[in-house]
Amino acid sequence: MVPAELFARVEFPDHKILAQTKDFHDSLTKPPGSLGKLEQIGCFISACQGQIPPRPLNNSKIVVFAGDHGVATKGVSAYPSSVSLQMAENITNGGAAINVIARTTGTSVRLIDTSLDHEAWGDERVSRSCGSIDVEDAMTQEQVERALEIGKRIADQEVDAGADILIPGDLGIGNTTTAAALVGTFTLAEPVVVVGRGTGIDDEAWKLKVSAIRDAMFRVRDLRQDPIAIARKISSPDLAAMAAFIAQAAVRRTPVLLDGVVVTAAALLANKLAPGARRWFIAGHRSTEPAHSVALDALALDPILEFGMYLGEGSGAATALPMVKIAVDLMNDMSTFSSAGVDGPLNASSEAPEQNTE
């Protein structure tokens, strides 16, 4: 399988609409550019939808991809792998941070268990955990193809159900190690540059994490032009499914609000699977994980928030969602200078007042 067999060509947001949005924003009752990034976000959503003003975002959806990671047995996390399944149940029961944020922002949460370490099977399952990426492949070829198919299918389901913006989230002990390995591989960054503290590891665990990431990156050193092979060897079922979900959202012309390092690592993979997918991304926030800034730079994304968050689950992106909605609502609900009877700015070509030089 090659990416072109799985994903259709990504079309870019409407550049003509994007060019027209500046004039539209400048007609609103405010000095040009005075709403800063809110103007940029609103213009982006207009281009994604192909209309000015954009439709209000009334059907956002958070999809959390959950899976365990074999590399977690190497001492790279402060928590045991059993926490993954326990937290998945917490999300299902509505008690996690992402549930609270989702309720506050009027967003629904869907949990996808691709590879948590328990006996279960279903349409969204790939495996029970996955290989330890420092010494073995994360998945077989059959498993990676299944993970990609699952992620693509879920994106289609959500878009077909009317989602107007998608927020992927992550859950799984050890997933920041996998994410850092992917970021290092795609950006050519050194392991020590992309390794953070994850769940709060000490110095010894940090060294183990660096070692695991170094070994994983070495295993794919000759495969940088083969994203599916990279996914098979050093990602995981949950990250591969998430990458396919993000890629297919772009194919379906649906903006994706990115969360932290794990989601953004999957977004790097998505942009390899479906070139140009990054044109449909908004960075919700910047996490404290070093690899996240490296990945954001590689995707040329400027995050909305910098709150020092690093939880995952889609929490940072979901927290930024109200800013995106506000950006859209401003374009819909603000008066223009003409409709409000407010004088606009002086014509730029008008003669400037004389300066008093005395």
Curated annotation (Swiss-Prot):
EC number: 2.4.2.21
Role noted for this protein: Catalyzes the synthesis of alpha-ribazole-5'-phosphate from nicotinate mononucleotide (NAMN) and 5,6-dimethylbenzimidazole (DMB).
Keywords on record: Cobalamin biosynthesis, Glycosyltransferase, Transferase
InterPro entries (alphabetical): Nict_dMeBzImd_PRibTrfase, Nict_dMeBzImd_PRibTrfase_bact, Nict_dMeBzImd_PRibTrfase_N, Nict_dMeBzImd_PRibTrfase_sf
Protein name per Swiss-Prot or TrEMBL: Nicotinate-nucleotide--dimethylbenzimidazole phosphoribosyltransferase
Domain of life: Bacteria
Keyword Glycosyltransferase part of the UniProt annotation: yes
Alphabetized SUPFAM superfamilies for the sequence: Nicotinate mononucleotide:5,6-dimethylbenzimidazole phosphoribosyltransferase (CobT) (SSF52733)
Catalytic activity: 5,6-dimethylbenzimidazole + nicotinate beta-D-ribonucleotide = alpha-ribazole 5'-phosphate + nicotinate + H(+)
Active site annotation, chain numbering: 313 (proton acceptor)
GO annotation terms (biological process): cobalamin biosynthetic process
Pfam families per record: DBI_PRT
Family: Belongs to the CobT family.
Entry keyword Magnesium: no
GO molecular function: nicotinate-nucleotide-dimethylbenzimidazole phosphoribosyltransferase activity
Gene for this chain: cobT
Pathway connected to this protein: Nucleoside biosynthesis; alpha-ribazole biosynthesis; alpha-ribazole from 5,6-dimethylbenzimidazole: step 1/2
